[in-house]
Curated annotation (Swiss-Prot):
The gene is alaS. GO terms for cellular component: cytosol. NCBIfam families: alaS (TIGR00344). It comes from Gluconobacter oxydans (strain 621H) (Gluconobacter suboxydans). This is Alanine--tRNA ligase. Consists of three domains; the N-terminal catalytic domain, the editing domain and the C-terminal C-Ala domain. The editing domain removes incorrectly charged amino acids, while the C-Ala domain, along with tRNA(Ala), serves as a bridge to cooperatively bring together the editing and aminoacylation centers thus stimulating deacylation of misacylated tRNAs. The lineage of its organism: Bacteria, Pseudomonadati, Pseudomonadota, Alphaproteobacteria, Acetobacterales. Belongs to the class-II aminoacyl-tRNA synthetase family. Catalyzes the attachment of alanine to tRNA(Ala) in a two-step reaction: alanine is first activated by ATP to form Ala-AMP and then transferred to the acceptor end of tRNA(Ala). Also edits incorrectly charged Ser-tRNA(Ala) and Gly-tRNA(Ala) via its editing domain. Binds 1 zinc ion per subunit. Its EC number is 6.1.1.7.
Length: 879
């Protein structure tokens, strides 16, 4: 049997032998493409290459691309587990030509690989072409020898691909595999095309046109090729299966689920095992690519996937977290092809377990609510939308999870009602917001980029430079001049030493000067990737386009910033060595006064761990090793051990920053892809100090630290505060900690004494407030400033002393009255503490109370003990 891993390797090796660059799978998080939640097709990483916005050092490429379809336009989530070919995660294999070869070669490559290398019978294959694409039809006859009846012309949009309303487009040709007449279904384009007999295995897109904004369509000067073959679907054919979930990889995951849950893989929980197997893949790969479960965006889609799998595990009997225990089975199947699974195994497992622990507590209660509501509805079919929203809002049930649970009961949900409830919540929670025109502003920078080209950055080697003003902007308007005044303007130079904010490093401050002109720059940003825009105010003279200026950054500020940036690199490596390789950067800020570093880490770091990390960073700084910067290909950098950071987009030539002494395995202590500015030697960073560690969101921790002059200032401030504390305690600084510990112990002892005195007072040593009414002992006391929590303990103590009777204790702590009433067991058939406390609460202006017949508690804004105790006496007289 040909394994899925063998098929993937054979596909890539074949196209590699045909002059294609084998490009590793891109992240599931699209880079610089806010229009997509996830990478949902093999061509997504090459989108800018096809549109001409990006160039690559190769014109042919092949990939096995990770793909997730679980949100937006491409959403297969609801069908997963119930069909043979739907997945949230799958691999899309493909070959691409960027103006290199076209239709003849694409068809030749596909036919040769399928029939020669993979050995598929030629009579089992047929092709579709766009109805107007006679070239493709002729090529299938010539190259593959297909007869007319096996070349099917399709006139619909299914066989014509568009990137969008504008941009590259072209006809498609799809290759189908025929399972034979023993399987129901008709060929593509027929009424029975949805059957399982004919299965699409490969789509060839011939990009030969360009759709213009005015609706016209022109020929592309350099036609291109984009193809896609779903690995899981093709593996099923190669392995003699008609169901993707029967292939070796999927079957191994299903068997792992069956073993852990002690439920037959093909028994009554067959669909649940399939859901778990599929969702395990999307969960693990998304976390490995930096997505963590959250309440919005990509994180929320991940949470939906995870919770759907967890509900199916619960259906099969899971009472504790088990989802994460399936991860080793996935790594065994796919870890060799995707080493990020191995690299981030600890983070993936901890994230899965933590999410399951959080959800398990809510799942049972939510399912109980759902069951109760269905019982209440009777024969009504649809669950009300407000109930579905309550499940979402209170118990964390995504709508599709509720729909999934209802599907098994033959019921549906009122989606319109759910959306109405959701809209009402958004309306309540959302602050008034008005669009700021940022989208229009971005158009300004696109135009500026087209007109002037990219900015030339000189700041790696110089902190000052002569430059020419290319443009001056305010908002969306380009200005003819900018006189001195209070308005901030944006300035574009042909070259600049100013660093534009990116990669976590803040932008430079400084000045632009010319005879009679001075501009103070207070921010520098990058726009459209490679435009450096200076923001500031003209404080003297008038600035005009074309003017020659002298640009100079604030040296002291840049020095502090680059120190913190270099310290961040050392901190990152120290964390990975001290805490674990699952630690990866989730965000950073490198400013003159501090650094902030967000990391993937499921639990808080201990004081000991933070101390060890801080010590390691300082030890590396003391080595004073040189910092080296080199340009190389991304493949060379990764081979050398450089870390590429999540969320950053890199070109084929990357800047690699190495610092610290290396060892036998690595040429340097820290090696990262980075475009920022850094110190010359690590000793220039100066002392390093971690200031705080805190949580940002589930699975993300934040470390804040300072170095250099900022660390020295912190040390002086800390020393000053410590001396102030020692002076107040009237002890030497060295004894301050022990003196504070002694005071805390003394306070603890005094607090216990006060509580004991209050207890004695309440139990009546010399302050008895006990009386007999109608043969019933009443111990009623107003204890003043005593907490409600203490009242209950005192009431229990007094009840034991009087043996038989009623105890009523009141207090007025924190501006609110409280009452506890205790009735001894022998009197509960005559008196109910809950009823008594509710009558008391009414007198106190409260809204009832609660408890048991022998002990109840209530409160209210008033603390009129005389009125309450009078009510109790009257009640006892009538008992």
């Amino acid at each position: 049997m040909t394994s899925t891993n063998d098929i993937r390797s054979a596909f890539l090796e074949y196209f590699g032998s045909q002059g294609h660059r084998i490009v590793p799978s891109a992240s599931l998080v699209p880079q610089n493409d806010p229009t997509l939640l996830f990478t949902n097709a093999g061509m997504v990483p090459f989108k800018n290459v096809f549109t001409g916005q990006e160039t690559r050092p190769y014109s042919r490429a092949t990939t096995a691309q990770k793909v997730v379809r679980a949100g937006g336009k491409h959403n297969d989530l609801d069908n997963v587990g119930y069909t043979a070919r739907h997945h949230t995660f799958f691999e899309m294999m493909g070959n691409f030509s960027f103006g290199d070869y076209f239709k003849p070669e694409a068809i030749e490559f596909a036919w040769t690989l399928l029939t020669r290398d993979f050995g598929l019978p030629k009579d089992k294959l047929l092709a579709t072409v766009y109805a107007e694409d006679e070239d493709a039809a002729d090529l299938w006859k010539k190259i593959a020898g297909l007869s007319d009846d096996r070349i099917i012309r399709i006139g619909t949009s299914d066989n014509f691909w568009r990137m969008g309303d504008t941009g590259p487009c072209g006809p498609c040709s799809e290759i189908f595999y025929d399972h034979g007449d023993s399987v129901f279904g008709g060929p593509p384009g027929s009424p029975d095309e949805d059957g399982d007999r004919f299965v699409e295995i490969w789509n060839l897109v011939f990009m030969q046109f360009l759709d213009q904004p005015d609706g016209s369509r022109d020929a592309l000067p350099r036609p291109s090729i984009d193809t896609g073959m779903g690995l899981e679907r093709f593996a099923a054919i190669m392995q003699g299966k008609r169901d993707n979930y029967d292939t070796d990889t999927m079957r191994a995951l299903i068997e792992a689920s069956a073993e852990i849950m002690h439920q037959d893989a093909d028994g009554p929980f067959k669909a649940s095992h399939r859901v778990v197997a599929d969702h395990l893949r999307s969960t693990a790969f998304l976390i490995a690519d930096g997505v963590l479960p959250s309440k919005e965006g990509r994180g929320y889609v991940l949470r939906r996937i995870m919770r759907r799998a967890m509900r199916h595990l619960h259906i099969m009997g899971a009472k504790e977290p088990v989802f994460y225990r399936l991860l080793p089975a996935l790594i065994q199947q796919m870890g060799a092809a995707y080493p990020e699974l191995v690299q981030h195994q600890a983070l993936i497992a901890q994230t899965m377990k933590g999410e399951e622990e959080r959800f398990t507590a809510l799942l049972e209660r939510g399912l109980t609510l759902l069951s109760d509501e269905l019982d209440r509805l009777g024969d009504k079919e649809a669950l009300p939308g407000d109930v579905a929203f309550k499940l979402y809002d209170t118990f964390g049930f995504p709508l599709d999870l509720t729909q999934d649970a209802l599907r098994e009961k033959g019921r549906t949900v009122d989606e319109a009602g759910f959306e109405t409830a959701m809209a009402e919540q958004r309306k309540r929670a959302r602050a008034a917001w008005v669009g700021s025109g940022d989208a229009a502003a971005e158009t300004v920078w696109f135009d500026a980029r087209d007109k002037h080209g990219p900015s030339e950055f000189l700041g790696y080697v110089s902190e000052k430079a002569d430059a020419e003003v290319q443009g001056i902007f305010r908002g969306n308007d380009e200005l003819a001049s900018a006189p001195a005044g209070d308005d901030t303007v944006a300035i574009l130079l042909n070259q600049t030493p100013f660093y534009g904010e990116s990669g976590g490093q803040v932008g430079d401050h400084g000045t632009l000067t010319a005879p009679g002109v001075r501009v103070e720059i207070t921010d520098t940003q990058k726009r459209n990737g490679d435009l450096i825009v200076h923001y500031g105010k003209v404080v003297e003279g008038t600035l005009k386009p074309g003017m020659a200026v002298h640009a100079e950054i604030d040296h002291a500020r840049r020095t502090a910033v680059r120190g913190h940036h270099s310290a961040t690199h050392l901190l990152h490596e120290a964390l990975r060595r001290q805490i674990g390789t699952h630690v990866t950067q989730k965000g950073s800020l490198n400013a003159p006064e501090r650094l902030r570093f967000d990391i993937s880490q499921p639990r808080p770091l201990t004081d000991e761990e933070l101390a060890a990390v801080e010590a390691e960073v300082n030890a590396r700084i003391r080595e004073n090793a040189p910092v080296e910067t080199r340009l190389m290909t991304q493949e060379e950098a990764v081979a050398e051990g450089a870390m590429a950071l999540f969320g950053e987009k890199y070109g084929d030539e990357v800047r690699v920053v190495s610092m610290g002494k290396g060892d036998d395995d690595r040429p340097a202590y820290s090696i990262e892809l980075c475009g920022g500015t850094h110190v010359g030697r690590v000793g220039e960073i100066g002392p390093f100090r971690i200031v705080s560690e805190s949580g940002v969101s589930a699975g993300v921790r934040r470390i804040e630290a300072v170095c250099g002059l900022a660390a020295e200032a912190l040390a002086l401030e800390t020393e000053s505060r410590l001396k102030q504390i020692a002076d107040l305690l009237k002890v030497p600084v060295a004894d301050a900690a022990s003196r504070v510990a002694a005071l805390l112990e003394e306070r603890k002892s005094l607090t216990a004494q006060v509580s004991d005195l209050q207890r004695k007072l309440a139990t009546g040593e010399g302050t008895s407030a006990t009386e007999s009414i109608n043969g019933i002992t009443l111990s009623a006391r107003d204890l003043g400033d005593v907490s409600p929590k203490e009242l209950k303990g005192l009431a229990e103590s007094i009840s034991k002393q009087i043996a038989s009777g009623v105890v009523a204790l009141m207090s007025s702590a924190d501006g609110r009255g409280s009452i506890v009433i205790a009735v001894t067991k022998d009197l509960t058939d005559r008196l109910d503490a809950v009823k008594l406390v509710r009558e008391a609460s009414a007198l106190m202006g409260g809204k009832g109370g609660g408890g048991r017949p022998d002990m109840a508690q209530a409160g209210g804004p008033n603390a009129d003990s005389d009125a309450v105790f009078a009510m109790l006496r009257k009640t006892l007289e009538a008992a």
